C-alpha cells in the first residue's frame, strides 16, 4: 500500500506541487497550527484542502493540550512553542472529532483517583487531561451513551483552548493580537465541521 501510494505521489502528486516543494525546501512559514487527533479517519490536510506547507499539524490521542507544566508532558508543549515562537503562526485550531476513542476511554474510566484515568499505560496517563473537561460539560448533558460522548468531545476542545492560554508565549501572543485560538469538531459520518464561537462557546457549521 505505501509503495503504491509513493509511486502515485511521484507520478502525479509531486509534479502538481513541485514549485511549492522547491520553495519549501528553503523553509516553512505555515500560517496555521492544527492540533488534531491521531485517529486515521481525521486528516486535517484533507479536511481543509491544504497543500504542502500550509498547515503545521500536531496529532495526538484525543487532540489534547495539557496545561503548561515545564516538568510535565512536553511533546505537545514543544510543538506549541515552536509554532508560536519559531514559525509565528497567526492561528491555532484545536480540532476534535466524532467517535473519539480517547474520549471514550476516559468516559469508561471515570471515577479514578485524581491524576489517574483508570485506563492502563501511557494512554491512561495521557487521557487524564480530559478530567479538566468535566467542569465544561453543559448542565443538560446526557448521563451516558452517544450524547455524553459528544458532549465530552466538545468540552474537551474547550478545555484544551483554556489550557493553551496557560502557556505564557500563547497568552502573550493572544494579548498582543498576533495569535487567535479556535475550536472545531469534525463529524466523520457526514464530513461536517462545526466551529466554536469564541465568545459564546456555541458550535455552528461555517457557511
Residue ranges and their predicted role:
Residues 1-30, 53, 63-90, 101-207:
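Divalent-metal-activated hydrolytic enzyme cores
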Residues 25-44:
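N-terminal low-complexity or amphipathic/hydrophobic leaders
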Residues 35-37, 59, 93-97, 182-187:
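Short beta-strand segments
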Residues 39-41, 97-102:
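Gly/Ser/Thr-rich loops at beta-strand to alpha-helix junctions
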Residues 40-62:
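Catalytic core of membrane glycerolipid acyltransferases/transacylases, capturing the structured
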Amino acid at each position: 500500500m505505501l509503495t503504491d501510494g509513493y509511486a502515485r505521489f511521484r507520478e502525479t502528486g509531486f509534479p502538481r506541487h513541485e514549485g511549492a516543494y522547491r520553495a519549501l525546501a528553503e523553509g516553512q512559514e505555515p500560517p496555521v497550527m492544527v492540533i488534531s487527533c491521531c485517529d486515521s479517519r481525521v486528516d486535517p490536510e484533507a479536511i481543509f484542502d491544504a497543500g504542502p506547507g500550509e498547515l503545521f499539524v500536531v496529532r495526538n490521542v484525543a487532540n489534547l493540550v495539557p496545561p503548561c507544566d515545564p516538568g510535565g508532558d512536553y511533546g505537545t508543549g514543544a510543538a506549541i512553542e515552536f509554532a508560536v515562537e519559531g514559525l509565528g503562526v497567526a492561528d491555532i485550531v484545536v480540532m476534535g472529532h466524532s467517535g473519539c476513542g480517547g474520549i471514550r476511554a476516559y468516559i469508561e474510566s471515570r471515577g479514578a483517583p485524581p491524576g489517574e484515568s483508570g485506563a492502563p499505560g501511557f494512554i491512561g496517563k495521557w487521557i487524564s487531561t480530559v478530567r479538566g473537561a468535566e467542569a465544561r460539560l453543559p448542565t443538560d448533558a446526557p448521563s451516558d451513551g452517544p450524547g455524553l460522548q459528544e458532549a465530552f468531545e466538545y468540552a474537551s476542545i474547550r478545555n484544551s483552548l483554556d489550557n493553551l492560554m496557560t502557556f505564557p508565549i500563547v497568552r502573550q501572543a493572544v494579548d498582543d493580537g498576533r495569535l487567535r485560538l479556535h475550536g472545531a469538531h469534525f463529524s466523520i459520518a457526514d464530513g461536517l465541521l462545526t466551529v466554536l464561537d469564541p465568545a459564546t462557546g456555541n458550535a455552528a457549521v461555517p457557511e
